[in-house]
Amino acid sequence: YAWVRWYEGVYGWSAGLDSFAPEFETYWMNFLYIELVLEVTTAAILWGYIWKTRDRNVMSITPREELRRHFTHWTWLVMYGIAIYFGASYFTEQDGTWHQTIVRDTDFTPSHIIEFYLSYPIYIITGGASFLYAKTRLPAYQDGLSLQYLVSVVGPFMILPNVGLNEWGHTFWFMEELFVAPLHYGFVFFGWAALGVLGVINIEVEALSKLLKKDLV
């Protein structure tokens, strides 16, 4: 994230103000193409690996192994929380200030290339990996699908399809960039769905409390 913010700061002003300039293609459209390929590849490899190496006897693991997996799962949850912050908060708010300062001449502005097509996929990939890890390796998540988990992962994921509606609206209505515009309500609604992770934490606390009553052998 630090490198991305540095890149945006350096090349956003020098090469990102005119989408018809050759330097925009060099520094920003190529950035977009590369990140999309890397994201699809990373998601396929990471999710595929977690699923391929799933534990087929997850209900038979020892309490000690289950505790270890819960700590690994917590690591995934923390990573997801960090990714959600940078995607749905930091870079999203930054995008608002960009549009209040610069007149857009393309949907693929430097701030959009980083916000919509980099920071959002990062938290989607991380959230999906966290969900798959819990589903394939922890007994607490074996009975059906956790509604709390689905809300906390699918909700923020739906921000990405909402981007299409948002860009269409801005193009069709030539709207002023206002945070309170009805067109932005979807970002707020789906963004707050991330609070479903509190329900996941509740499941974790319950599972850990049961484990602590056992001999960890």
Give the ranges of each region predicted by the language model.
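C-terminal transmembrane-bundle signature of multipass membrane proteins
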Residues: 2, 146-217
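Transmembrane alpha-helical segments of multi-pass membrane proteins
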Residues: 63-88, 144-161
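Membrane-helix interface motif
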Residues: 3-20, 53, 87-101, 163-175
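Perimembrane loop-to-helix junctions flanking transmembrane segments
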Residues: 11-30, 61
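Generic alpha-helical transmembrane segments
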Residues: 36-48, 113-132, 192-196
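Cytoplasmic membrane-interface regions of multi-pass membrane proteins
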Residues: 48-70, 96-103, 128-148, 172-176, ...
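Interfacial helix-start motif at the membrane-water boundary
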Residues: 25-45, 72-78
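Membrane-proximal helix-loop-helix units in multi-pass membrane proteins
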Residues: 78-144
